[in-house]
Regions:
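Bacterial N-terminal signal peptides
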Residues: 8-16
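An acidic-aromatic pocket/loop used at catalytic or ligand-binding sites
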Residues: 2, 20-121
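Bacterial N-terminal signal peptides that target proteins for export
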Residues: 1-8
Length: 121
């Protein structure tokens, strides 16, 4: 009976971990994925080494507006250490420990945004 209980516990622990992992942009464990956005994974870019990195992800939604997405990231990213630097047109800029994060509106209908994380040399 104890073995069965342990197996059930491990199953639920794995399930919870999988659900939590789904709440972040794939490949960017420090960038949350807003409800209503889905990731276009075939367009992701990821490369780097011990000193620098470049990550790029595309997200899309047919029902969200960019203003709601911008508000979500302005509120949530500072909780993960990102410091909001302001807007540059339709771009949101954040900075954290030698890295920049940029959120760019690529299109309106459907909404497509690009999130880029770059290390500063």
């Amino acid at each position: 009976m104890k073995k069965l209980s342990a197996l059930i516990f491990l199953f639920f622990l794995t399930l919870i971990s999988t659900v939590n992992a789904a709440n972040f942009v794939e490949g960017m464990e420090d960038v949350p994925l807003m409800d209503g956005l889905s990731q276009i994974t075939q367009d992701d870019i990821s490369f780097g080494n011990e000193e620098t990195r470049l990550l790029e992800a595309y997200l899309t939604s047919r029902r969200l507006k960019f203003a709601a997405v911008a508000n979500f990231y302005r509120e949530s990213l500072p909780q993960l250490g990102w410091i909001y630097q302001g807007n540059r047109g339709n771009n949101l800029l954040f900075y954290r420990e030698g890295e920049t994060l940029e959120i760019i509106k690529e299109s309106v209908k459907p909404l497509i945004i690009r999130i880029t994380v770059k290390s500063k040399p």
